[in-house]
Structure formats: C-alpha cells, structure tokens
C-alpha cells in the first residue's frame, strides 16, 4: 500500500504545481472582472491537467512495474504490487478534473467548496468504502484497493457538478456592475 500511495503522490505533485501556477492568473482576472480570461485560463488548466493525468494513467496501466520498481527492488513484492497498482490508480485518468476544479475554486475566492470536495473524496467516500467494500466482495483485500478508484470517480463527478454550478455563478457575478459605494 505504501508503494501505491507513493506513486499517487508522485502523480499528484505536478498536477498541483500546474494548478497552483494558474491560481494567480485566474484570481487576477477574476478580480479584474475579465470573464473571458478566467474561462480561457480554466479551459487551459483543465486540458493540461486532464492530459497529464490521462497520460500518467495510461503509463501506469501499460507498465505498472516501472512505477513499482522506483520504490522497491524486491521482485516478489513488485510482482504483487504491479496489478494492484492498476486497480488502485484506476481513477487517476480523471484526477486532472478534480485538481483543476479544486484549485480554481480557491482562485475564485471559494475555498469552502475546495475544502468540501477534498473532504468528500478522502473522508466521506474513501474511508467508508474501505470498510464497506471488503464486506461486499469475496476478495476482501481487493475491496480495500478498489475503494480508491471508486471514491475518485464519485468525487470527480460531484466536483464537476458543483464546479459547473459555482463557476457559472462566479461568471455571472463578474458581469454585474460594481457599485463604487461598496468599495468605500
């Protein structure tokens, strides 16, 4: 499991870096009420994050042993961990959506939504699934590994729906004329 979480962290760091790099651009243009640039920045961020996460997902599906061998030289462990890595990171291809939306929430001054989707993924979904799935399937260990991609898929769906609603709301807010008295 440590190998799999290490590979997951390895995958997450560049995604977070890309998304954090877009934050000041999005925030600046949101503050300047430049909706076109906010949309364009988000679109580019989403495409970049999604392309990266799909490419990494494909690499893990094609050659999981390559990633496992970064963290262990034990061939028996690598032989067991490689197919499990495919299962554990099954939702990685969609993870670019999660990160792009989460970081854009923060850029638009909506850190609460960002926190909600982060908590949703790990605590509301993953922890209960880790306990529930082993009771529902015969191979209990497989149930634990399957919890991660299932939680990821549900969380990405929830995030995309919430983001779509909040992003439209933020864009409408930018179109409203500002009241100079409110700035005093």
Where are the regions that the model predicts?
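Small-residue-rich hydrophobic transmembrane alpha-helices
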Residues: 1-58, 62-64, 95-114
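Short runs within selected transmembrane alpha-helices of multi-pass transporters and secretion channels
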Residues: 15-20, 88-107, 113-122, 144-160
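Short alpha-helical transmembrane segments in multi-pass integral membrane proteins
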Residues: 26-91, 134-184
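Transmembrane alpha-helical segments of integral membrane proteins
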Residues: 125-134
């Amino acid at each position: 499991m440590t190998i799999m979480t290490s590979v997951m962290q390895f995958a997450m760091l560049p995604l977070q870096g890309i998304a954090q790099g877009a934050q000041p651009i999005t925030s600046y243009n949101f503050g300047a009420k430049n909706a076109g640039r906010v949309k364009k920045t988000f679109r580019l961020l989403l495409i970049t994050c999604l392309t990266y996460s799909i490419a990494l997902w494909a690499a893990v599906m094609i050659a999981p042993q390559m990633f496992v061998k970064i963290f262990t030289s034990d061939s028996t462990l690598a032989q067991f961990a490689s197919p499990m890595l495919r299962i554990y990171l099954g939702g990685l291809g969609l993870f670019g959506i999660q990160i792009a939306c989460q970081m854009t929430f923060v850029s638009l001054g909506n850190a609460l939504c960002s926190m909600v989707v982060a908590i949703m993924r790990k605590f509301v979904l993953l922890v209960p699934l880790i306990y529930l799935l082993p009771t529902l399937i015969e191979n209990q260990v497989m149930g634990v590994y399957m919890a991660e991609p299932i939680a990821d898929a549900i969380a990405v769906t929830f995030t995309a729906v919430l983001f779509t609603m909040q992003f439209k709301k933020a864009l409408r807010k930018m179109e409203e004329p500002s009241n100079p008295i409110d700035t005093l």
